[in-house]
């Protein structure tokens, strides 16, 4: 990234998803990462009318090699109607921030503001999340009953499809960055025994099937 002194923040940036190399489509949910040393002094006044949730200052994050990450804030924007990349980029540029990105899971993005589903990362305090513009934080932090039921179905399907035989293996996955939002919470807070028995029954079923195959081959 260019040094801040050489960046013309008035110039619109190209609409390109860095992962797919394709333009972002319009969407309701967007994310922006901002850095304290780049922010204008009145940055909260700039975003005050936008439906935004702001994370606590992430000043204790580390890279996989243990190197400390640059301090930053995560911003989650949730609109009632679709917004274009250009509209959100205008906000990002006013904050002297990198280009915005579309958010696929609003709940996951909001819970990531404090690493709720990433216990291997530093746990920030939900009480330090700030909201503006009528952002409904509580409904985003909590998984709905329907979300929990669907997530549990997805967890059981994952266990079967991947032939998970040990609770530890599944717990390790739930703690990883690849796991969907809420899985670690569902596993540890209310469903551990059920999932443990489900994994055990899968193992027993495979053992039974294996014995039958051996008998038929004798």
Curated annotation (Swiss-Prot):
Name of the molecule in the record: Replication protein RepB
Amino-acid biosynthesis in keyword set: no
Record-linked InterPro entries: Plasmid_rep_OBD, RepB_C
Protein family according to the UniProt entry: Belongs to the Gram-positive plasmids replication protein type 2 family.
Coiled coil (residue ranges): none
Segments of this protein annotated with the region Disordered: 1-26
Biased composition (Basic residues): 16-26
GO molecular function list: DNA binding; DNA topoisomerase activity
Known role: Is essential for plasmid replication. Nicks the positive strand at the plus origin of replication.
Gene3D superfamilies: 3.40.1310.30
Any Gene Ontology CC annotation: extrachromosomal circular DNA
Alphabetic keyword roster: DNA replication, Plasmid
Species annotation: Lactiplantibacillus plantarum
Taxonomic lineage of the native organism: Bacteria, Bacillati, Bacillota, Bacilli, Lactobacillales
GO BP annotations, alphabetical order: DNA replication
